[in-house]
Amino acid sequence: LETTLDVEQLLKLAELEEMRQESPDKDLEQETGRRLPKKQDKFCLAVAKDEAFCFYYQENLRAMEAEGAVVQYFSPLHDKAIPEEADGLLLGGGYPELYAKKLAENETMRTSIFQAAKRGMPIHGECGGYLYLLEQLQGEDEAYYPMCGVFSGTGIKGKRLGNFGYI
């Protein structure tokens, strides 16, 4: 690990949290016209969690709860729509390509997410969650399946695993 892990850089990145601007919310509100929820506001963060979306850092979810978010889990595979009380969506990593056919078959969920995006709901998709937000995704069977259509594009299978690393 000593030869491949830059501990000093990781510590510097961790210190960035302590160096927040005094009022980043105000800048974002002016830029987007959206008021960010305050700690006392109830903000329901709907988090996709099932066989297709299963990679989350628990400390991130705990940090969001500490900032006032109420985390509510839902399943893009098994539920018909996002939770009605959702104020924002988090679609984490996982293996949507392994479940592409089943995700595509759940048209009511895909429509629910597309409509939420169209209304301006904050949505964060990372890794597999981002792939689910695309127009279509190539499944493990190499067929192409419709996804949510929030972003234009097609997720395709590569010949090998991509690189992973720090910021």
What are these regions (language model features)?
Residues 37-39:
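Short, flexible hinge/linker loops that cap or flank conserved catalytic cores
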Residues 96-167:
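Cysteine-nucleophile active-site neighborhood
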